């Protein structure tokens, strides 16, 4: 097996591990205690240790924390601006979902966290997020800061050829729905359409208007 084949195999394995890790982090509880039961993909509700405190650098150059960024329901995605297709497609989908939600009266923030510390400087991120959505918040940071955020969200990335200015980066592609008070609510895979994401997020936001006790999701806020 050559180097590229080994890298692809490792990336595929890691992608499976990420999905399994997210699933393992979700604890099912009875429907009757969960006001979000009708919104979730599974048969139970989720109290998940996904998300948590982070310190990163915004596209404005300011140092920010999760409390500064996730001030309203947010769609959080990990990627990189030099990504040839996956990241632009997923980010466009998230931006379209946010626009649909705005038409329905819901204010949701799309957040793009870069896993490419070397190339995704604040100005580069600004150019990328401006193309996606004026609402999108771009975040980068040192490798250590990015690693901490990736770990908190049970995400994954692998820089194939460190030092190569044209290197590709393998990474997980789930989008996380986060609430500033409750933390993690659900996640969306790449096959979810803007309409599917908007319908799901809208369900959660409508349910948030209904008083009830749903287990907090461990985002550290």
Swiss-Prot record:
<dbReference type="InterPro" id="IPR036249">
    <property type="entry name" value="Thioredoxin-like_sf"/>
</dbReference>
<comment type="function">
    <text>Involved in both aerobic respiration and photosynthesis gene expression.</text>
</comment>
<keyword id="KW-0186">Copper</keyword>
<keyword id="KW-0602">Photosynthesis</keyword>
<dbReference type="GO" id="GO:1904960">
    <property type="term" value="P:positive regulation of cytochrome-c oxidase activity"/>
</dbReference>
<dbReference type="InterPro" id="IPR003782">
    <property type="entry name" value="SCO1/SenC"/>
</dbReference>
<feature type="binding site">
    <location>
        <position position="83"/>
    </location>
    <ligand>
        <name>Cu cation</name>
    </ligand>
</feature>
<dbReference type="Pfam" id="PF02630">
    <property type="entry name" value="SCO1-SenC"/>
</dbReference>
<feature type="binding site">
    <location>
        <position position="87"/>
    </location>
    <ligand>
        <name>Cu cation</name>
    </ligand>
</feature>
<keyword id="KW-0479">Metal-binding</keyword>
<protein>
    <recommendedName>
        <fullName>Protein SenC</fullName>
    </recommendedName>
</protein>
<comment type="similarity">
    <text>Belongs to the SCO1/2 family.</text>
</comment>
<feature type="binding site">
    <location>
        <position position="171"/>
    </location>
    <ligand>
        <name>Cu cation</name>
    </ligand>
</feature>
<dbReference type="GO" id="GO:0015979">
    <property type="term" value="P:photosynthesis"/>
</dbReference>
<feature type="domain" description="Thioredoxin">
    <location>
        <begin position="45"/>
        <end position="210"/>
    </location>
</feature>
<dbReference type="InterPro" id="IPR013766">
    <property type="entry name" value="Thioredoxin_domain"/>
</dbReference>
<dbReference type="GO" id="GO:0046872">
    <property type="term" value="F:metal ion binding"/>
</dbReference>
């Amino acid at each position: 097996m050559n180097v590229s084949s080994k890298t692809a195999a490792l990336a595929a394995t890691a992608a499976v591990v990420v999905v399994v890790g997210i699933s393992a982090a979700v604890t099912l509880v009875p429907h009757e205690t969960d006001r979000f039961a009708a919104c979730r993909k599974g048969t139970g509700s989720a109290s998940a240790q996904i998300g948590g405190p982070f310190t990163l650098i915004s596209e404005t150059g300011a140092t920010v924390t999760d409390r500064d960024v996730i001030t309203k329901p947010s769609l959080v995605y990990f990627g990189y601006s030099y990504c040839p297709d996956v990241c632009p497609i997923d980010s466009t989908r998230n931006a379209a979902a946010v626009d649909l939600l705005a038409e329905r009266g819901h204010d949701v923030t799309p957040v793009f966290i870069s896993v490419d510390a070397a190339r995704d400087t604040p100005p580069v991120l600004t150019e990328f997020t401006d193309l996606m959505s004026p609402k999108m918040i771009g975040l980068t940071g040192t490798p250590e800061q990015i690693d901490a955020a990736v770990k908190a969200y049970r995400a994954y990335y692998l820089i194939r050829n460190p030092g190569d200015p044209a290197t590709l980066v393998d990474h997980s592609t789930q989008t996380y729905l986060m609430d500033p008070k409750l933390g993690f609510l659900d996640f969306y895979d790449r096959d979810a359409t803007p309409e599917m994401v908007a319908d799901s997020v809208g369900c959660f936001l409508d349910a948030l208007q209904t008083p009830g006790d749903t287990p907090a999701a461990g985002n550290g806020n």
